[in-house]
């Protein structure tokens, strides 16, 4: 993959050059930054990027992960045997729904292999959760310990990487946790599981406060992106940062904002080494991660 990076460097312009420059930033970050964030959106886990992300965590390229509930959903579903099949962006969604399929871009999955599988997994481990108050990173560890090493959560649990999910209720995992608590009321007299997101914030505060240098690879936008850069401001901003996105900045959205905008908020240092790659992550993330 490093040969491809060097080929991109020789192209000398446009996004190919940005990919080569991003590799340089990430390579230095892995060597110099003690806290290395990996932020990504859940949709990526519906693709084969799941294996690349798990491998990067397993190799300890990143030691803190911030993602969405959807990432957990897809990771668990795939671990439970769900088949995510190639399709088309132009499939008839009315027809798909009638046949019992979900569509995510040009990936399709049977409805019975998504929510029901996630719920089955969570409910199988309810008793380990009842009566506990858990941060999302603690929940992710408990779930990851029950999943194979080639999953994202499984790799993180074994590598000691903490996985934070600030929007934990926004997906099948969150709904399954609610069902888990419904069962607790009938079987355990109300000894429910509690998810304490402020405990996550306290842990992030300690991670950032105790860091010497902060780095982040941020793929996509939304809550997983903002949570990383929000906390970085309390240490003066990120020292190294690479964004990969196809969002535009002209609507003022967080997802489309470039690293330079974050400087005005104190979330990225003026001296930071930063690169923005305008590209589909499925095209460039495998190259970057395998080259490191």
Swiss-Prot record:
Catalyses: [eIF5A protein]-L-lysine + spermidine = [eIF5A protein]-deoxyhypusine + propane-1,3-diamine
The UniProt entry annotates the active site at: 267
Q: Identify the keywords attached in UniProt to this record, alphabetized.
A: Hypusine biosynthesis, NAD, Transferase
For this protein, the record's Pfam families field holds: DS
Q: Which residues form a coiled coil?
A: none
- This protein's superkingdom? Archaea
- Choose any GO biological process term that the UniProt entry carries and state it: spermidine metabolic process
Q: PANTHER family recorded for this chain?
A: DEOXYHYPUSINE SYNTHASE (PTHR11703:SF0)
What family is reported? Answer: Belongs to the deoxyhypusine synthase family.
Listed NCBIfam families = PRK01221.1 (NF002294)
**What protein is this chain from?**
Probable deoxyhypusine synthase
Organism, scientific name: Pyrobaculum aerophilum (strain ATCC 51768 / DSM 7523 / JCM 9630 / CIP 104966 / NBRC 100827 / IM2)
Q: What gene does the UniProt entry assign to this protein?
A: dys
């Amino acid at each position: 993959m490093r040969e491809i990076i060097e080929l991109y460097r020789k192209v000398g312009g446009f996004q190919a050059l940005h990919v080569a420059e991003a590799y340089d930033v990430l390579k230095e970050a892995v060597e110099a930054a003690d806290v290395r964030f990996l932020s990504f959106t859940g949709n990526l886990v519906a693709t084969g990027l799941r294996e690349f992300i798990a491998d990067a965590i397993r190799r300890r390229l990143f030691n803190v992960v911030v993602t969405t509930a959807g990432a957990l959903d897809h990771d668990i579903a795939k671990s439970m045997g769900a088949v995510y099949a190639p399709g088309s962006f132009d499939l008839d969604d009315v027809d798909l729904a009638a046949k019992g399929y979900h569509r995510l871009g040009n990936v399709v999955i049977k409805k019975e292999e998504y929510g029901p599988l996630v719920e089955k997994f969570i409910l199988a481990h309810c008793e380990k959760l009842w009566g506990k108050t858990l941060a999302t990173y603690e929940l992710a560890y408990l779930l990851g310990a029950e999943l194979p090493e080639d999953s994202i959560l499984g790799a993180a649990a074994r590598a000691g990487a903490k996985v934070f999910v600030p929007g934990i209720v926004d997906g099948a995992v969150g709904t399954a946790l609610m069902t888990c608590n419904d069962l607790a009321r009938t079987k355990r007299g109300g000894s429910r599981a509690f998810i304490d997101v402020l405990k996550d914030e306290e842990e992030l505060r300690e991670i950032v406060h105790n860091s010497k240098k902060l780095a982040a690879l941020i793929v996509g936008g939304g809550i997983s992106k903002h949570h990383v850069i929000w906390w970085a401001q309390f240490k003066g901003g990120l020292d190294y940062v690479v964004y990969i996105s196809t969002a535009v900045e002209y609507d003022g959205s967080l997802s489309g904002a470039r690293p330079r905008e974050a400087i005005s908020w104190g979330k990225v240092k003026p001296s930071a080494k930063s690169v923005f790659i305008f590209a589909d992550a499925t095209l460039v993330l495998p190259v970057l991660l395998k080259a490191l």
